[in-house]
């Protein structure tokens, strides 16, 4: 994948290690999930997943409980909005936001793009077709081994639940399926009693591009600004 990819991955991991930034994003996901489907994780799969992802980032239980309670307060008045943009070198950007003030959010995003020559926000729907939406689950390889399952066994067991692709990455196993199969795949993990490390819906570029180190470094400046915004909970690009 090249040095540019490694640079991008290392930079992203470093940013997401800033707990002061990641916790507010995780809390918003929990609050919105509780608002949409109720505050009981046992009956709200979306909330279960949001809590799971928060625990994976070592978010304290008190923070999780506070985020759930916030769903019934004025602070819980959040909405999900997606924005799209283009940058230099053919880079396409999709930004998923959770906000209580869409006017503030779009104004901030426009300011980041305006500070980057050649970058701009584009009308929603302009880039949607350039990305596939997928359900993505992560689990630990040793958890699969603890269940006396091979990777082939796991793949066979989850096919009926919507699995499309299984990939081994280090000590983790990545499971991908159709966007609409998220709930079904979640049920598949539960039926196997296989702990989920992380889960979510992701956008995967249909035609990824590669940038050289210089191009990546310039692009990172814009991506940093976007990801540092508390209203942005997910950022997707077509960078390989």
Curated annotation (Swiss-Prot):
SUPFAM superfamilies (UniProt xref): YebC-like (SSF75625)
Keyword Transcription annotated: yes
Keyword Transcription regulation: yes
Membrane-traversing stretches: none
Location in the cell: Cytoplasm
Gene Ontology CC: cytosol
Major localization listed first in the record, in broad terms: cytoplasm
Ranges in a coiled coil: none
GO biological process entries: regulation of DNA-templated transcription
Gene Ontology molecular-function annotations: DNA binding
Domain of life assignment: Bacteria
PANTHER family in UniProt: TRANSCRIPTIONAL REGULATORY PROTEIN YEBC-RELATED, TRANSLATIONAL ACTIVATOR OF CYTOCHROME C OXIDASE 1
Protein name: Probable transcriptional regulatory protein HPAG1_0159
Organism (species): Helicobacter pylori (strain HPAG1)
């Amino acid at each position: 994948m090249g040095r540019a990819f490694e640079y991008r991955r290392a930079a992203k991991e470093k940013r997401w290690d800033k707990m002061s930034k990641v916790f507010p994003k995780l809390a918003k996901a929990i609050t919105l999930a509780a608002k949409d489907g109720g505050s009981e994780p046992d009956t709200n799969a979306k909330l279960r997943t949001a809590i799971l992802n928060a625990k994976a980032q070592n978010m304290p239980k008190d923070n999780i409980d506070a985020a759930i309670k916030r769903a019934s307060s004025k602070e819980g008045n959040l909405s999900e909005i997606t924005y799209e943009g283009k940058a230099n070198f053919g880079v396409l950007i999709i930004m998923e936001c959770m906000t209580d003030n869409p006017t503030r959010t779009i104004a901030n995003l426009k300011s980041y793009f305006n500070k980057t020559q050649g970058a701009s926000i584009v009308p929603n729907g302009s880039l949607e077709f350039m990305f596939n939406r997928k359900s993505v689950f992560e689990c630990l390889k040793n958890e699969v081994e603890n269940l006396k399952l091979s990777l082939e066994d796991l793949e066979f067991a989850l096919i009926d639940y919507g699995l499309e692709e299984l990939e081994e990455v280090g000590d983790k196993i990545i499971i991908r399926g159709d966007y609409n199969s998220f709930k079904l795949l979640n049920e598949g993990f539960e039926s196997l009693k296989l702990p989920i490390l992380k889960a979510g819906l992701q956008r995967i570029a249909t035609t990824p591009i590669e940038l050289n180190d210089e191009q990546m470094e310039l692009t990172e400046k814009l991506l940093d600004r976007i990801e540092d915004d508390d209203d942005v909970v997910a950022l997707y690009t077509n960078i390989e």
